Amino acid sequence: MILTTEIINELIGIKESYQASDALMKILFDKGKREKMFRAFLEIDWHLDRDWFHAYFEEEHANKKKYAQDFTPDSISKLLSVIVGPSSKNLDVAAGTGSLMIQKWNHDRMSMSPLEYKPSMFFYQCEELSDRALPFLLFNY
């Protein structure tokens, strides 16, 4: 099943997409609700190697005119992670919903044997100034 705008709004518990950022931020601060919602997302889409909110945020929340918010296509994110290669420290200063860092994380973990890979070997830091994007970024991480 594909995560559509309607499904995401239902999982977050809202009727209109403009309510998503505030509602999601409240859920993130409640451990039980956060974990329950994450499991609900996983039941629909268990692929952790992509940004669940990429299309949703771009369609419903991006402010291209005022803040020049635009999203990196998955193909470019994958290419950049290959060009950069495995590295123990990673920084995205305009992370949006996290699609670049998700691809970097996926590339790093897939570049090693499952017997050698430890999440503690890598540090990922994301920065985002948009109050609307921040809850989606936090949920993705």
Which residues does each PLM region occupy?
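A near-ubiquitous, low-amplitude feature marking generic local secondary-structure context
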Residues: 39, 59, 63-64, 88, ...
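Conserved aromatic-histidine-acidic binding/catalytic patches
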Residues: 44, 64-69, 125, 129
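Acidic-enriched, low-complexity/disordered segments with a strong bias for Aspartate over Glutamate
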Residues: 22, 30, 45, 49-51, ...
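Class I SAM-dependent transferase core
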Residues: 48-82
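A short N-terminal interaction module
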Residues: 1-59
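Conserved S-adenosyl-L-methionine
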Residues: 74-141
